[in-house]
Structures are given as C-alpha cells and as structure tokens.
C-alpha cells in the first residue's frame, strides 16, 4: 500500500436502528473532528429549553467513543433521562489511487466494516424490555436486566489452524 494514497472515504447508506423516533428528535451526527463543547451546547440548549424531548447521538469508527462521551455528559447534566443504545457495523468504502501514474497500478476500492453507535436520550419513558435500555439514574454499564434476546451471541468454536 506504500504506492497508493487514499483518495476518499464514503460511508455507505444504512437504515437507522431506531426508525420509530418522534419527528421533533434532535439527531446529533458526531464526527471525528466534532468539538464536544459545540455538540453539548446544542443538545443541552434544546433539552433544557424544552424545545425537544429526545436527542440521538450517533457516531461511527473513531467517533463512536466521542458520541458515547457526549451522551454520558448530557445524562450527568440533565437528570431523569432514559437511555437506549444500539450498536451495529456500517460499511465504508475507501478509494485508493496510485501515488505515481507511471507505475501501471490500478485504482483500488476497499470495503470495511466499522463499528457504529446510536444513543437515544429521552425525557419520556422508553420500553424497558428493549435491548440496550438503561433507566434514569442507573450507573453507566448497569442497565435493566437483559432479556434472553439481548445477551451476547454464542461464541463460535475456534478453527484448528494447525497443519
């Protein structure tokens, strides 16, 4: 890959894991270069001002951690918020072009699967049986009792790679 440079990266469209959101929901798309203070200023202003009752922080790749951080800060500053978290992988398509045109190399397109997170914070009660629900006042990481469909998937057996 030393003879290639990245020409661009495109996140392929995917459906939201939370399609049933009310129309007044504030959707905060967190990017790698987003400033946390700007994101928090808008989200806290709308929540505390009463113009919205729901905020969704979403981020993929390196921005996933920043989206979770924003949600945790908002939960700490606005008491009584219900939380619903969804995780999934998104496809990203990277384009690579040769660094010098006379090498005879073709342009490349690479598809990657990157982790993504959506965190819904709501003043209104949410369905506690939903996978990823966390009630107000619960310490981070300690949500409701998971239903059997929410637990981790069974691990696959490791393949024997010895020859």
UniProtKB/Swiss-Prot annotation:
One of its GO terms (molecular function) is nucleic acid binding. It is found in: Nucleus. It holds the Pfam family Alba. Residues 1-24, 126-163 are annotated as: Disordered. Keywords: Nucleus. Residues 153-163 have a biased composition (Basic residues). Its main location: nucleus. It comes from the Eukaryota. GO terms for cellular component: nucleus. Belongs to the histone-like Alba family. May be a component of ribonuclease P or MRP. This is Ribonuclease P protein subunit p25-like protein. It comes from Mus musculus (Mouse).
